[in-house]
């Protein structure tokens, strides 16, 4: 008979400790980093949740967690590129209410062949690069901290170091 571990019993389905059953790791408790980056992969916002949470449920919290000041949408349009997992009317509405122009491909639409006619081709690799930069920090690769505040603090420290390195590289 299957018994739940004490970690999963805390909070409403793992919200208190930002962990949840990981569907890809035999149901062990795990956490997920939701990451918002700019066009170069530099992190703008990070939110933690349980590994079993869908990304679209944390979109509003992620957009509210942006640490840089957004320019006025009337002067400079802000585009938000998301993948097919965010193809819900609530996600489009959340992005539009915060002044973003959402670019979300339809779930049932075929993937277009890459051509030169794209003005701004979709680039999912930008977020993946951001995640790989976080994974270079050994403290973040495996979550040892039990409290989500401490783990989020280490993630934010890593984001500061990533931004600092990007600024150093850009200024020379």
Q: Predicted regions: what is each one?
A:
Residues 111-117:
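Short, charged, surface-exposed secondary-structure boundary motifs
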Residues 57-58, 76, 112, 147, ...:
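Flexible domain-boundary/linker segments
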Residues 85-88, 108-111, 132, 139:
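Short Gly/Pro-enriched loop/turn and capping motifs at secondary-structure junctions
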Residues 94, 98, 118-172:
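Basic, amphipathic alpha-helical segments enriched in Lys/Arg and hydrophobic/aromatic residues
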């Amino acid at each position: 008979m299957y018994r739940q571990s004490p970690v999963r019993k805390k909070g409403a389905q793992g919200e208190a400790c930002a962990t949840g059953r990981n569907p890809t790791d035999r149901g062990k408790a795990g956490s997920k980093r939701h990451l918002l980056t700019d066009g170069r992969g530099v992190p703008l916002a990070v939110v933690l949740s349980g590994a079993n949470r869908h990304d679209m449920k944390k979109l509003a919290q992620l957009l509210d967690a942006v640490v840089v000041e957004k320019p006025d949408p009337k002067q400079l349009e802000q585009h938000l590129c998301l993948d097919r997992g965010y193809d819900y009317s609530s996600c489009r509405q959340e992005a539009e209410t915060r002044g973003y122009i959402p670019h979300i491909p339809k779930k049932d639409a075929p993937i277009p062949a890459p051509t030169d006619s794209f003005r701004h081709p979709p680039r999912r690799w930008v977020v993946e690069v951001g995640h790989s930069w976080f994974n270079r920090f050994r403290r973040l690769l495996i979550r040892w901290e039990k409290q989500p505040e401490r783990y989020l603090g280490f993630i934010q420290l890593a984001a500061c170091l990533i931004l600092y390195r990007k600024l150093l590289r850009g200024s020379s």
